[in-house]
Amino acid sequence: MQPFTSLTGRAVSLRRGQVDTDQIIPAEYLKRVTRSGFADGLFAAWRADPDFVLNQPYAEGAEILIAGPDFGIGSSREHAVWALLDYGFRVVISARFGDIFRNNSVQAGLLPVRLPAATVTTLADAVEADPATVVTVDLAGREVRASQQAGGPVLLRAPIEIDDYTRWRLLEGLDDVSLTLRNAEEIARYEESRPQWLPVAG
């Protein structure tokens, strides 16, 4: 997966709490056998409403989603994360995430940023007041910043709450498969030393 160090770009605000994975991508869009091609299903029911935030011109090209609390609850479908990535989001900011959704996000390279509810509200207020607000998510520096323009005065600054191991994996772009392949030579040597009558990994 793609490493994540820092991202500066525009954000959109979705002020809905308890958004479950079926709302993120309905079941009828899960028929693909690949990990791509799910963008059309993202928030499909809500996107039928012309007033929905992702249908607004200012939302085009946004890479950061500011969500309400308890985002990604419900079923364990990985497609919810894949749909967000396919649409172009690299970061989701919320006060709370569903545990399985958060783990799936880390595995796929989507950064789930947990901030205090009041901070999320302040950030959403700024983005809604001025969609051109620039948001920086600096994983390397463990910080979220917002300003009215790139390089301008900082409107908001907040630390990112993330454990060292998860941060390291995202910075390096390592999912479980990539982590295993880092030890490919050791695994091969172990397999070669096993008795022939035992099964091998290959």
Residue ranges of each PLM-predicted region?
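Cytosolic catalytic domains that perform sulfur/thiol-centered chemistry
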Residues: 1-202
